[in-house]
Amino acid sequence: MYQPDFPTVPFRLGLYPVVDSVQWIERLLEAGVRTIQLRIKDKRDEEVEADIIAAIALGRRYDARLFINDYWRLAIKHRAYGVHLGQEDLETTDLEAIQAAGLRLGVSTHDDMEIDIALAAKPSYIALGHVFPTQTKQMPSAPQGLAQLASHIERLADYPTVAIGGISLERAPSVLATGVGSIAVVSAITQAADWRAATAQLLDIAGVGDE
C-alpha cells in the first residue's frame, strides 16, 4: 500500500474545478464546491499575491480544500490548504518546506514513469491525465483514455487520485466508473452556457468529497 508523507486528503475529493481567478473561486464555493484549485500561470509572485491571499481567505470561509497551483512559497506564507505541482516543478520546489508547513501536496502525472516520480515524493494525491483531448493547455503527451486511466487506478489502489483533462458533464460518469477518487474540470464549468447548472449537475455526479 502506498502511503503519503504529506498530510492526507480524503480519497474522494469530489468535484475539483481548476480556475484562474478569485472571481471563479468565490462563485464556485458559493455554489457548493468544496475542493478547488487556483491556477494562475506565468506571473511574478508579487503580481499574484493579493489574489492568492483572497482565494485562501475564501477557502477558509467556506471550509474548503483550496489548492494553489505552482506558487508554493506564497501558499506556505499565507497557509493555504494545499499546493499542486506539475512534474516540471518538482525538481525546483522545496518539498520539505511544503511538508514542514503542513500543506497538502498534489502532483500531476501523464504516464507510468511520471507516476513513479510522483510516488517518490509521497504526495497527498496524484492527478492522472490528460484523460481526453483538451484545449485548456498545450499537452506534450497523447490522451490516456479510460482504459489506461483504469490501469493506473488499479496500480495505485487506495491512493487518492484525481482524473483531469477534457472531462465534460457527459464524460464524468464513465471517468468515475474507473474507480478514480475525484474529477478535475476546467472548461466544463467555465465555458458552459450556464455555469451554475453545469456545476450543480457535476456536483450531483461527483459529490463534494468526503470529510
UniProtKB/Swiss-Prot annotation:
It comes from the Bacteria. Disulfide bonds: none annotated. It catalyses: 2-[(2R,5Z)-2-carboxy-4-methylthiazol-5(2H)-ylidene]ethyl phosphate + 4-amino-2-methyl-5-(diphosphooxymethyl)pyrimidine + 2 H(+) = thiamine phosphate + CO2 + diphosphate; 2-(2-carboxy-4-methylthiazol-5-yl)ethyl phosphate + 4-amino-2-methyl-5-(diphosphooxymethyl)pyrimidine + 2 H(+) = thiamine phosphate + CO2 + diphosphate; 4-methyl-5-(2-phosphooxyethyl)-thiazole + 4-amino-2-methyl-5-(diphosphooxymethyl)pyrimidine + H(+) = thiamine phosphate + diphosphate. Its EC number is 2.5.1.3. 2-[(2R,5Z)-2-carboxy-4-methylthiazol-5(2H)-ylidene]ethyl phosphate binds at T134, Q135, T136, G166, V186, S187. Mg(2+) binds at D70, D89. 4-amino-2-methyl-5-(diphosphooxymethyl)pyrimidine binds at Q37, L38, R39, I40, K41, N69, S108, K137. Pfam families: TMP-TENI (PF02581). HAMAP family: TMP_synthase (MF_00097). Belongs to the thiamine-phosphate synthase family. This is Thiamine-phosphate synthase. It comes from Salmonella schwarzengrund (strain CVM19633).
